């Protein structure tokens, strides 16, 4: 296979209802041969979960529809989008297998899928990052995803479970950087030994008469900035903008 430094292939079965057993078996063979990662989506809404159960009556929960083909973490690095309504058994298997969750708050809101219990995932030590799921969202901005994640976590706390505290700015920022970046290796952090993948943001276009701390400035950028605030981009230490 072609070895590109910054662009790598990933297996992407759309979701269980659109994939035959024969296809999943073949994907499993390809994964084991080339040691590829896999991405799909999981437990996004109740209708989908019921549909998967109907199609895969031998499974106890949605995640088993992937794990029965060895496509659910472990030796197969896996990202699962959404995980809005994952059962206790499914969550336990995701944690055991090291499955990454891509939280897509804007998509989940637009499609009325529900609110993912992100606080639980963080507290239980699952790997979780942020996604846009642009097919169901309106923006590919990870800063926007951070703001959306904080906002929907407040709704979950207020409307669903008052014991699940809303996300902090720091937690949302972590999810949008190292939380998801760690799936790809040592990216998403300024720690020693990590690749310098970064953007430079200029907040001078968001004026305020107040004296702000670095955290305050970051929070304003998360909520108020857009691509016009990006003044430079670096990939693996190389400036590309």
Which residues are covered by each model-predicted region?
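His/Asp/Glu-enriched, well-ordered alpha-helical/loop segment
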Residues: 68-74, 119-207
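C-terminal active-site-proximal or functional interface alpha/beta core segments in diverse enzymes
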Residues: 80, 88, 108-115, 139-140
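Helix C-cap/helix->beta junction micro-motif
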Residues: 33-34, 97, 124
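Metal-coordinating catalytic core of metallo-dependent amide/deamination hydrolases
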Residues: 1-83
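Long hydrophobic segments that form regular secondary structure
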Residues: 86, 90-99, 104-109
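C-terminal cap of metal-dependent C-N hydrolases
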Residues: 195-241
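Divalent metal-coordination and catalytic microenvironments
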Residues: 11, 41, 80, 94, ...
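Short, acidic/turn-prone active-site loops that include or flank metal/cofactor-
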Residues: 44, 105-109, 134-136
């Amino acid at each position: 296979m072609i070895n590109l430094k910054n662009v790598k292939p990933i297996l992407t079965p759309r979701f269980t209802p659109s994939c035959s057993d024969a296809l999943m078996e073949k994907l499993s063979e390809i994964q084991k041969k080339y040691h590829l990662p896999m991405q799909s989506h999981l437990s996004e809404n109740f209708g989908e979960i019921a549909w998967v159960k109907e199609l895969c009556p031998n499974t106890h929960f949605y995640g088993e529809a992937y794990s029965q083909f060895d496509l659910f973490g472990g030796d197969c690095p896996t990202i699962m989008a959404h995980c809005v309504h994952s059962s206790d058994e499914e969550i336990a298997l995701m944690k055991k297998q090291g499955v990454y969750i891509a939280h897509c708050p804007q998509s989940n809101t637009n499609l009325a899928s529900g609110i993912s219990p992100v606080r639980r995932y963080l507290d239980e030590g699952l790997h979780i990052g942020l996604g846009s799921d642009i097919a169901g969202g309106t923006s590919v901005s990870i800063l926007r995803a951070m703001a959306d994640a904080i906002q929907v976590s407040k709704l979950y706390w207020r409307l669903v479970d008052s014991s699940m505290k809303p996300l902090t700015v720091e937690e949302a920022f972590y999810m949008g950087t190292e939380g998801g970046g760690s799936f790809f290796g040592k990216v998403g952090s300024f720690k020693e030994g990590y690749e310098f993948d970064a953007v430079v943001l200029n907040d001078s276009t968001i004026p305020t008469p107040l004296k702000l701390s670095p955290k305050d400035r970051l929070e304003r950028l998360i909520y108020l900035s857009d691509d016009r605030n990006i003044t430079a981009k670096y990939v693996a230490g190389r400036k590309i903008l």
